[in-house]
Amino acid sequence: RHMDMSMKGNLKGRHSIDDAQVLNLPNQHGSPAQLRVVPETMDMKMTMLGAMYAPNDEITFLAMAMQHETSMRLNTYGAMSRTLLGSFTSRSEGLGDTTLGALLAGGDVTQKYLNGTWHYGLALSIPTGSIQQTGRVLTPMNQQISGKRLPYPMQLGSGTYDFKPSLTFNSAAHGEWRYGGQVSGVVRLDDNSQGYRLGDKTNVQGWVSRRLAAFASASIRLDASYQDQLRGADSAITLPVPTAQTDFTGGELANLSVGFNFVGQHGIWAGHRLALEWTSAIHQKANGVQMEFQDTLTLGYQKAW
């Protein structure tokens, strides 16, 4: 599965703000006293390779590895003024965190208006992604510096072991229609080696799909999530930019997605599945100032034996 996510501009709470408003905000690192670097755009590409194995109908084991590629474009302003000194791009790339877990059958539901099956998931995220990514930055003193520790969103992993439980319901077919829902979470089990932990996360989502043909279906999905603020701090992340402020982390996010799913039926195509989904943010309430989510495009391929 491959995902391409874009962000553009900045929000304070629910409202868009410009560079001039960001420059009025205090810098928790002290020098300079106010923020002087403002993110403009961010593009994150994630490629996930997963495998699942079901020895019986009651349990399915899963494993997933992830490759990250992130780039962020930023403007730098003078330390003693609001003069625009220039722009620069930060990049990070490498292996993300690895997930191992299992899906366990929970049984059937046969109510009048709720007919289907549910299962629960238990997974552990292993901190294989780097949290010490560095890059070249333009400082408010108008200096190009290499080897500077990049802010939290540019790191490749959480640095912690994370517990990832989930509960999922999938309906039986109602004519051409199906529906489902899921509640899931991420619980950080400890602080990482750099002295912080990302916020715990809760997600709720629901979907409806309709069969278009024997091999194709379309779906609409709505998801909402809440993430706590980051706790602790990495003493090496000190750039006067919103993404380096620990109070400016976490918040609310809701997305609306439209997708198409194609499943091979016969011959060499049997067992092959191709999925395409476009996601757009419809609500975001950031803690402090954060970048504004835009769109995500996901392309997935699956082969079943």
Predicted regions, residues:
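Glycine- and aromatic-enriched membrane insertion/assembly motifs of diderm outer-membrane
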Residues: 34, 38-70, 174-203, 211-218, ...
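Outer membrane beta-barrel transmembrane domains
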Residues: 15-23, 27-29, 191-305
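A subset of solvent-exposed loop/turn segments in beta-rich extracellular surface proteins, enriched
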Residues: 1-101, 134-143, 228-235, 239-243, ...
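Short loop/turn motifs that connect adjacent beta-strands in outer-membrane beta-barrel proteins
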Residues: 7-9, 58, 107-118, 131-133, ...
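Outer-membrane pore/translocation modules
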Residues: 62, 66-193, 197, 243, ...
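Transmembrane beta-barrel strands of outer-membrane/channel proteins
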Residues: 1-4, 63-67, 118-126, 181-185, ...
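Residues on the lipid-exposed face of transmembrane beta-strands in outer-membrane beta-barrel proteins
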Residues: 49-53, 63, 100-106, 122, ...
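Transmembrane beta-barrel architecture of outer-membrane proteins
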Residues: 32, 43-48, 95-101, 117, ...
